[in-house]
Amino acid sequence: MKKGLHILLLLALLFATVACTPARKPAPPTVPPGGSPTTLPTNQTELNKIAKKIAREAAKTEKVKRATAVITGSTAYVGLDLVAGVEKSETDRIKEEAANRVKSAEPRLKRVYVTTDADTVTRIRHVAEGLAKGRPLSSLMRELDEIKRRMVPKRK
């Protein structure tokens, strides 16, 4: 009888030890050191720095004199001033190449809109200057909506 009681207590103790052991779950994945985050910052100052970086990258495209960029959310609006004498047939290739350069320079962007239309480029420059002076993005939304209406995405 005592032997059966000891076995029963031993089994109960063994069951309690196994049942109360914490589950072994894998650790959540972490970004490796030096890895890049997957989302853009929300701080407008940081977004302005990234916009300047992608504008410099777009300006490296052949036959582009100057580029201006604005970022809202995960969308970049890029305006290109082309050198004189560029034919209309070349502009699509130039815009595509600039969009590819921008996307390579900043892979966190989901959409890149590129234009060579002088009026739209002026509007983008106006918004970029306003943001650089510290104006809130909300005060420039009407202008951005008009820019977006005029543009077609070149790279998704």
Region spans (language model):
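Bacterial signal peptide processing site
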Residues: 21-24
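Short edge beta-strands and adjacent turn/loop segments
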Residues: 59-82, 116
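N-proximal, solvent-exposed amphipathic alpha-helical segments enriched in charged/polar residues
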Residues: 30-32, 36-67
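Hydrophobic helical h-region of N-terminal Sec-dependent signal peptides
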Residues: 9-14
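Bacterial N-terminal signal peptides that target proteins for export
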Residues: 1-8
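C-terminal motif of bacterial Sec signal peptides marking the signal peptidase cleavage site
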Residues: 16-19
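Short, non-transmembrane amphipathic alpha-helical segments
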Residues: 51-57, 87-109
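C-terminal low-complexity, charged extensions that often adopt amphipathic alpha-helices
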Residues: 99-156
